[in-house]
Swiss-Prot record:
Bilayer-spanning residue ranges: none
Reactive site, annotated site positions: G23
Lineage of origin: Eukaryota, Metazoa, Chordata, Craniata, Vertebrata
Tissue specificity annotation: Ubiquitous expression including brain, white muscle, heart, gill, kidney, spleen, liver and skin with the highest and lowest level in brain and gill, respectively.
Family, similarity comment: Belongs to the cystatin family.
SUPFAM superfamilies: Cystatin/monellin (SSF54403)
A cellular component term, taken from the record's GO annotations: extracellular region
Subcellular location: Secreted
Motif range (Secondary area of contact): 67-71
Keyword list, A-Z: Disulfide bond, Protease inhibitor, Secreted, Signal, Thiol protease inhibitor
Protein name: Cystatin
Record's function text: Cysteine proteinase inhibitor.
Natural source organism: Oncorhynchus keta (Chum salmon)
Length: 130
């Protein structure tokens, strides 16, 4: 008799555990315009905060997620690196140095909260480590 109760409960628990949390973070597609715009915003804000004369760019996207929260929260884990372009210079496409000693790579976690209907986008987390 107990197995008639235990088996369905285990099946429900297994299904819920594998389905993911409703409203929780999910993988973001880097081909999506909203995701790309949020990452670009994060990079611009990050560069404003760095005490370096050179622009930093994303060398590699390690992880990208999004979460519906009264708007959209984007969570990025990225590998950043220095470019040869100086801050405040003429805007052009700048790639990260190929030489790791020049690129000085480091890992960052950025969180961006976007509410497009309010024309509002904010950086809520900008955390980096060497």
């Amino acid at each position: 008799m107990e197995w008639k109760i235990v088996v369905p409960l285990l099946a429900v628990a297994f299904t819920v555990a594998n389905a993911g949390l409703v409203g929780g973070p999910m993988d973001a597609n880097m081909n999506d315009q909203g995701t790309r715009d949020a990452l670009q915003f994060a990079v611009v804000e990050h560069n404003k905060k760095t005490n370096d004369m050179f622009v930093r760019q994303v060398a590699k996207v390690v992880n990208a997620q999004k979460q519906v929260v009264s708007g959209m929260k984007y969570i990025f884990t990225v590998q950043m690196g220095r470019t040869p372009c100086r801050k405040g210079g003429v805007e052009k496409i700048c790639s990260v140095h190929k030489d790791p000693q020049m690129a000085v790579p480091y890992k960052c976690t950025f969180e961006v909260w976007s509410r497009p209907w309010m024309s509002d986008i904010q950086m809520v987390k900008n955390q980096c480590e060497s």
